[in-house]
Amino acid sequence: MAKAVTIKVKLVSSADTGFYYVAKKNSRTMTEKMVKKKYDPVARKHVEFREAKIK
């Protein structure tokens, strides 16, 4: 069986609220860590979310 191209990653809030999103990432084309600016409902503002491994 072939290795999956897309993997799931956890996007953790940089505001240290403990809130996170789960996103899909193409591991072949996006080799660097994913960073997105999204809404954090705990902090109630838009902050950067950085990629972390799903445990």
UniProtKB/Swiss-Prot annotation:
Gene3D superfamilies: Ribosomal protein L33. It comes from the Bacteria. The keyword Ribonucleoprotein applies. GO terms for molecular function: structural constituent of ribosome. The keyword Ribonucleoprotein applies. GO terms for cellular component: cytosolic large ribosomal subunit. PANTHER family: 54S RIBOSOMAL PROTEIN L39, MITOCHONDRIAL (PTHR15238), LARGE RIBOSOMAL SUBUNIT PROTEIN BL33M (PTHR15238:SF1). This is Large ribosomal subunit protein bL33.
